[in-house]
Amino acid sequence: MSDFQREQRKNEHVEIAMAQSDAMHSDFDKMRFVHHSIPSINVNDIDLTSQTPDLTMAYPIYINAMTGGSEWTKNINEKLAVVARETRLAMAVGSTHAALRNPRMAETFTIARKMNPEGMIFSNVGADVPVEKALEAVELLEAQALQIHVNSPQELVMPEGNREFVTWLDNIASIVSRVSVPVIIKEVGFGMSKELMHDLQQIGVKYVDVSGKGGTNFVDIENERRANKDMDYLSSWGQSTVESLLETTAYQSEISVFASGGLRTPLDAIKSLALGAKATGMSRPFLNQVENNGIAHTVAYVESFIEHMKSIMTMLDAKNIDDLTQKQIVFSPEIMSWIEQRSLNIHRG
């Protein structure tokens, strides 16, 4: 594939992603908090700091991986980096493969560091990159963490995608052992299982982003690029973010779990944190905000999102993220069926 074709593919991904709409129904709607009428705290008591063994985030929200690798996406990364700087959010760039192949494309990613020199930035590579390239991806952005995206459904629907996956787990293990910053194993919208969590724990992984279905749909994106558009029947493949977080429960004491995929509102973010996530990521909402409404409006959107989270936490009498994990939740019969059929041990306060 030529560099021009790769740039075109990056732009197609963004165009199709922006055109997608939120799912009509979400598993976040199938879980409810139990309301208690009189909180014992005030809004000003809320501490939204997200703390993991290696990373401290001012807020449990991050701009998740989406783009880079073309002139248009350079402009997007530049604007998102300004938003991240002004709101103190962490930010992940999209796959840096284009820059690792062609130095001319490096600036479409490094613009994020240029615009946000003191901020927290995650670099991003695929599960098949050589260790040396993973190290290069971290150095490229002076990144505080490295996302490794695992995206087999996307690859298999992508006309020119990868068809070989047998080396992925071993390669991830090699990268984890060599890279000096936290390595986050990141799905791309298909969710994670407890079996995968076991495998990742065995090779030393300490961070995952479950990225469940319901948000940006890469099966649909790649199917739109197919000549016959003949794989749309896979559109609903995978686990939701709620199901994925429940799948991780037994591993949350050893692995820091991030949640993304289909988060629409501050309440969805709070529900993710209550299920054990340390932070929550969004891609398309930020992309659409910054492209359609500009930087200032997007900054205001983030500030409002944070204030709404504080209000919800006050209603829940939760001073911090850890408190949220003790709050009572009622699940729908459908989610309870998933918990039972998957033999998941869910214990709550």
Curated annotation (Swiss-Prot):
Gene Ontology annotations of biological process type: isoprenoid biosynthetic process
Superkingdom classification of source: Bacteria
Positions with a binding annotation for substrate: R9, K10, S95, T96, H97, Q154
Pfam families: FMN_dh
UniProt EC number: 5.3.3.2
Reaction catalyzed: isopentenyl diphosphate = dimethylallyl diphosphate
Places the protein is found: Cytoplasm
Keywords: Cytoplasm, Flavoprotein, FMN, Isomerase, Isoprene biosynthesis, Magnesium, Metal-binding, NADP
Chain residues that bind Mg(2+): E155
NCBIfam families according to UniProt: IPP_isom_2 (TIGR02151)
Job description of the protein: Involved in the biosynthesis of isoprenoids. Catalyzes the 1,3-allylic rearrangement of the homoallylic substrate isopentenyl (IPP) to its allylic isomer, dimethylallyl diphosphate (DMAPP).
Protein name, as recorded: Isopentenyl-diphosphate delta-isomerase
Gene (name only): fni
